[in-house]
Amino acid sequence: MACLKLQAVTKSYDGVTPVIKQIDLDVADGEFIVMVGPSGCGKSTLLRMVAGLERTTTGDIYIGDQRVTDLEPKDRGIAMVFQNYALYPHMNVFDNMAYGLKIRGFGKEQIRQRVDEAARILELQPLLKRKPRELSGGQRQRVAMGRAIVREPAVFLFDEPLSNLDAKLRVQMRLELQQLHRRLKTTSLYVTHDQVEAMTLAQRVIVMNKGVAEQIGTPSEVYKRPASLFVASFIGSPAMNLLDGTVSPDGRTFILSDGLTLPLEIPQPQWGGRRLTLGIRPEHIQQTTSAQGVPMNLLTLELLGADNLAHGLWGGQSIIARLSHEEMPVAGSTLHLYLPPAALHFFDTDSGLRIEP
């Protein structure tokens, strides 16, 4: 095992347009880091640079104490698991897992020991003589992970390994990945576009957007204190409500575009007259009968079983409130909603960055 360090790493294919803007990252020995973001944000490119499949434009990559920036992938001490399983269809499970070791010149007994140990960890012993066509999607992905495990790498790299699986199997494989990491404690860098995977697997999350690491933090930090409007809108399902407006001169009221006002229970006079974006998560909005509640006309109600989502408008801007499964107001009715002060987030509308009271 080893730590992973990226120092001022950038990537540009034409020397002009940056695909990856300067990123610095320190991954501790045994840490599980997940990079999450939309398609085209640069997360897979960054992973491929760590693997050596892409060259960095500037900056350095270290695995342990070794600078690996210019080393070939085979010399970096990494193992990679891809979205497609990349199994040899004519080989059985044992030979698929053993093939890389045979190429590297390992002896038969050493290969057998490593494959047997990986098969035990992944519960693949009964399947070692089967061909890939005889396996389910989840079993094939476990074989792909086993092929990586037998290499005993310093760093595991995962490139959206669960994307080809159905929803139920993804849940199962997430649990298996968590258990696998607890057993092996190998430094891991994992790429996904699925925020649920990111939040459930990661010890720390890197939220990527247009080649920039918008925020690096624990899942709790990213959820509770998003560093930017992008992070606030990307993490959470449904996403955080974001309302553009202006703070009144005395800092006591947030004024939306059509003049609707939301009282700020904790006045912020230092923001008086400033254009800001107010954020609050749907699950933090409370329905109330009190006069302090802000009225919202209910446009539609989504029944999700465990809870319900109430959709409406405030100041011409969409708002979603998560209600309990017992609350089933009729479309067209008026809800009175309360925004707890501790649940409010504020962002500079122009820069998109979080600001603190």
Swiss-Prot record:
ATP binds at G37, P38, S39, G40, C41, G42, K43, S44. Keywords: ATP-binding, Cell inner membrane, Cell membrane, Membrane, Nucleotide-binding, Sugar transport, Translocase, Transport. It comes from the Bacteria. One of its GO terms (cellular component) is ATP-binding cassette (ABC) transporter complex, substrate-binding subunit-containing. InterPro entries: AAA+_ATPase, ABC_transporter-like_ATP-bd, ABC_transporter-like_CS, ABC_transpr_MalK-like, ABC_transpr_MalK/UgpC-like, Mo/tungstate-bd_C_term_dom, NA-bd_OB-fold, OB_MalK-like. Its EC number is 7.6.2.10. GO terms for molecular function: ABC-type glycerol-3-phosphate transporter activity; ATP binding; ATP hydrolysis activity. It catalyses: sn-glycerol 3-phosphate(out) + ATP + H2O = sn-glycerol 3-phosphate(in) + ADP + phosphate + H(+). One of its GO terms (biological process) is glycerophosphodiester transmembrane transport. SMART domains: AAA. It is a peripheral membrane protein. Residues 4-235 form the ABC transporter domain. It is found in: Cell inner membrane. Pfam families: ABC_tran, OB_MalK. Part of the ABC transporter complex UgpBAEC involved in sn-glycerol-3-phosphate (G3P) import. Responsible for energy coupling to the transport system. The complex is composed of two ATP-binding proteins (UgpC), two transmembrane proteins (UgpA and UgpE) and a solute-binding protein (UgpB). Belongs to the ABC transporter superfamily. sn-glycerol-3-phosphate importer (TC 3.A.1.1.3) family. This is sn-glycerol-3-phosphate import ATP-binding protein UgpC. It comes from Yersinia pseudotuberculosis serotype I (strain IP32953). The lineage of its organism: Bacteria, Pseudomonadati, Pseudomonadota, Gammaproteobacteria, Enterobacterales.
